[in-house]
């Protein structure tokens, strides 16, 4: 999203999360502000997720073939892992902002997001990932479903997130090394 913002291209967001232990599992609250639309996503631990103050939930279950999926393939060293996804899934988009895409899954607009470059910074997606989890979504970092991770600028990961576990499992199978 940084390049989007620098160029004046929507979407771009500002994110903030608070953790009591420096790990994702310690996240107490999170906010994602969509800078061009003014939408504000937020969540507190155990309190669910909201969009502009209204409770949100993830979309109904879809199979990968009919799901609306966002991906980031810029500078992807392992395009061979994306090929099965491209041939299997019908609705693929690239928005250029993982935090935006995660919040859109939380509100039911998107069904999944895939970024297997290994360069997603934990601090760039932590707030949106917390909101997604509080809305009922699920995720995998570096191939581990629901894994904890440190909230440091140096911590990077592969990220696959989805509205429901069966969809996440299908996407992990399609993109496995």
Region roles according to the model:
Residues 46, 56-177:
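An extended, acidic
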Residues 1-2, 24-26, 32-33, 78, ...:
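Short secondary-structure boundary micro-motifs
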Residues 3-46:
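DPxDG-like acidic metal-binding loop motif
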């Amino acid at each position: 999203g940084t390049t989007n913002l620098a160029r004046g291209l929507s979407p771009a967001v500002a994110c903030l999360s608070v953790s009591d232990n420096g790990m994702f599992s310690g996240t107490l609250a999170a906010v994602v502000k969509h800078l061009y639309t003014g939408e504000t996503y937020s969540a507190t631990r155990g309190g669910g997720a909201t969009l502009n103050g209204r409770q949100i939930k993830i979309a109904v279950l879809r199979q990968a073939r009919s799901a609306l999926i966002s991906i980031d393939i810029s500078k992807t060293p392992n395009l061979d892992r994306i090929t099965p996804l491209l041939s299997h899934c019908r609705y693929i988009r690239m928005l250029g902002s993982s935090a935006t895409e995660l919040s859109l899954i939380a509100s039911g607009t998107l069904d999944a997001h895939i970024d297997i470059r290994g360069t997603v910074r934990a601090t760039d997606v932590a707030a949106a990932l917390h909101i997604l989890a509080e809305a009922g979504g699920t995720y995998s970092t570096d191939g581990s479903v629901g894994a904890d991770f440190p909230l440091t600028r140096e911590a990077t990961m592969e990220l696959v997130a989805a509205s429901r576990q069966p969809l996440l499992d299908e996407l992990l199978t399609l993109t496995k090394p």
